[in-house]
Structures are given as structure tokens and as C-alpha cells.
Regions:
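N-terminal low-complexity, Ser/Thr- and acidic-residue-enriched intrinsically disordered segments
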Residues: 1-66
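Gly/Ala-rich beta-loop-alpha elbow adjacent to hydrolase catalytic centers
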Residues: 142-146, 150
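Residue-level signal for short, function-critical loop segments
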Residues: 75, 144, 172-174
Length: 260
């Protein structure tokens, strides 16, 4: 087993991956017009909605457990379609100067409409009502595309609010922006861990240089990569699933306890 980073909290990673999985239950309940609730130990604070194809749908939530705060972002249910249709175009980031980010991630995070505030506004408005001394830790997390939104969200929080110590644990996240974005992120987000399955294709996207011929856009990952391995190279959905990430993290924990 590869050594985990010194400050990486395996128990917290499992908890945050499990919360990331809850966003899919939240989405399914919305789609099926059914009630949804978090596990009993968590208190729901805010539902985060996305505007997509003229519809509003849940993109995650803010919750708390005791003095711990959590911002949790949902990924996509149509992974193969997203990979096929993605253009990877970059645009200037709307909330940090002189950096470029992927168009779709920026739009998903910052877009609202007449009926619902943008996910960005909902998070920042909520945090404006909270004093950093009111909580022990502020955790930002997400899986897949939710991991990309989490990266945008935490750097926005660090740059534009008084909450300077938020902590990111993401799972199966793609690259989000250019070198300048990654550099700015790494300088102002103090605690950041990107858990990736070495067999998962999504963390390899967008390509570092794309499109393949013109190389118009250049992408770079933010810190710090925490590699794990499960599945194989032939099953995109399995290698990318949040359930697979949870299972492997739990296996690492068990192995760590046995070897201790």
C-alpha cells in the first residue's frame, strides 16, 4: 500500500465520499418526486440547485454535524455522454482575475435564473451568515463533475470570503483550469486532497493540451493527488463509481489497522 499524505485523514475521506454519494440519492429522489433526507447525524442547511437546459435540479447541499460544516457537490449520472460531448473550452474565471477555467464547470457553478440563485451565490450567502469561529472545520467535497465544482467553490471561498481555512477532499475529479488557475489555487487553498483511482479515466480529462492538434487550451491539476487503485481499465463506470472509491478507502483503512 502506498503511504498516504501525512495530514490526510482516512476516516474523514470515507465520510466525505459517503456524503458525496448522498448527492446521487438526493438527485434520484428529486427525479422520482420522492422525499429525501440526510442520515440522522447531519442537519441539512441549504439545498444547492443547478440550472441546466431550462430546468432546476439539485446539485448538492450544505449540511452540518455538530460544529463541522460540509459543502457537498454532485457529479453526473451520464458520464459517458459528458466525455463524448465535452469541448473543454476555457473562459476567464468570473471570480478570480487572470486565470482561465473550463467553460462548463464555470457555467454550472455561477449560473442562476429568475427562480433560483446560482450555486455560487447560495454558498457565499450562507457563509456570510456564519462566523469562522462558529465551526471547527469547513469541508468542501464532491465526486466526478462535483469534484470540479468543489475545486471552483473552495478557491472562491478562500479568495472572496473570510473563511480562509476550508478543506477540500475530492474524488475522481477532472482538471479544472489552466496553469495560472492551479497556481493561484495552490497558493490560497491550504488543505486540498484529490483522491483518484489510477484506473479511472476522468481525472485524465480534460487533456493537459487540447484539442489534440491545435493545443489551444492547457490544463493543470490542483494539489495534492492521493492515488488509490481498484477495478480495471475496461470498465469506465465501475472504475469511476463513488461506491468503488468508498469500498477501496475502507479496504485501505482495514489494511492500515491490521498492519498497525
Amino acid at each position: 500500500m502506498k503511504r498516504l499524505p501525512k495530514l490526510f485523514d482516512l476516516d474523514k475521506a470515507i465520510e466525505l465520499a459517503t456524503l458525496s454519494n448522498e448527492t446521487y440519492a438526493q438527485y434520484k429522489a428529486w427525479k422520482d418526486k420522492e422525499a429525501w433526507s440526510l442520515p440522522a447525524e447531519y442537519e441539512l442547511e441549504v439545498v444547492l440547485d443547478a440550472v441546466y437546459e431550462n430546468d432546476n435540479m439539485p446539485l448538492g447541499f450544505i449540511c452540518k454535524k455538530g460544529t463541522e460544516l460540509y459543502v457537498v457537490w454532485r457529479g453526473t449520472q451520464d458520464l459517458e455522454e459528458w466525455i463524448e460531448d465535452a469541448k473543454y473550452k476555457q473562459v476567464p474565471c468570473s471570480f478570480i482575475k487572470d486565470v482561465d477555467v473550463e467553460l462548463g464547470f464555470e457555467q454550472m457553478y455561477t449560473t442562476g435564473d429568475a427562480n433560483v440563485a446560482s450555486p455560487q451565490k447560495k454558498v457565499l450567502d450562507y457563509l456570510a451568515t456564519v462566523n469562522p469561529s462558529d465551526y471547527t472545520n469547513l469541508w468542501v467535497t464532491g465526486h466526478s463533475l462535483g469534484a470540479a465544482i468543489a475545486v471552483l467553490n473552495i478557491v472562491d471561498i478562500a479568495a472572496n470570503t473570510e473563511h480562509k481555512s476550508a478543506i477540500l477532499y475530492s474524488f475522481a475529479g477532472p482538471r479544472v483550469g489552466d496553469h495560472n488557475f492551479a497556481s493561484e489555487y495552490n497558493s490560497i487553498v491550504n488543505h486540498s486532497y484529490r483522491v483518484i483511482n489510477t484506473h479511472d479515466e476522468v481525472p485524465k480529462l480534460p487533456p493537459q493540451d487540447c484539442p489534440p492538434i491545435l493545443h489551444t487550451y492547457h490544463y493543470e491539476h490542483v494539489k495534492h493527488t492521493v492515488p488509490i487503485t481498484f477495478g480495471n481499465f475496461w470498465n469506465l463506470a465501475e472504475d469511476h463509481s463513488i461506491q468503488g472509491y468508498i469500498k477501496q478507502l475502507e479496504a485501505i483503512k482495514k489494511e492500515t489497522l491490521v498492519s498497525a
